[in-house]
């Protein structure tokens, strides 16, 4: 299964190994267990570690393998195939709803500016020659002007 060149040498704890190569028994009460490794022992351990240049990377990454498996699944029927072709021709787009409009920062700033202008107008700080404009989102996005409707109602009474 594993080639001998792919095996990694086991890491030997230098604290548990004696200088003559024999392993000593682990003693739980020993003060040597809590000591920090000395530089000489670290160098010896590091010399034993080697990188294997004969190890080859896999042909495909994991994500690529998953994509290949998904693409290789057969289409169950003709209607699904047609639906996928149509979906690929028209990518999904976000739907613009009232909530998404309210979250849009530019639209929010415009709305706040209009509200602020309206408040100034009510206080009398701005000139009065501007016609009434409703600040609700329906009137804004439908471009519906209630002042024109009020004029139409007045014309019908005459």
UniProtKB/Swiss-Prot annotation:
Compositionally biased region (Acidic residues) = 26-35
Which compartments does it reside in?
A: Nucleus; Cytoplasm
Say which domain of life the source belongs to: Eukaryota
Instruction: State if rRNA-binding is listed as a keyword.
Output: no
Please cite one Gene Ontology biological process associated with this protein: epigenetic programing of female pronucleus
Its cellular-component GO annotations read: chromatin; cytoplasm; female pronucleus; male pronucleus; nucleus
Locate the compositionally biased regions of type Basic residues: 58-68
Q: Where is this region: Disordered?
A: 1-38, 54-78
Keywords, in A-Z order: Chromatin regulator, Cytoplasm, Developmental protein, Nucleus
Instruction: List, alphabetically, the InterPro entries matched.
Output: Dppa3 (IPR029096)
Tell me, in a sentence or two, what this protein's role is. Answer: Primordial germ cell (PGCs)-specific protein involved in epigenetic chromatin reprogramming in the zygote following fertilization. In zygotes, DNA demethylation occurs selectively in the paternal pronucleus before the first cell division, while the adjacent maternal pronucleus and certain paternally-imprinted loci are protected from this process.
Q: What is this protein called?
A: Developmental pluripotency-associated protein 3
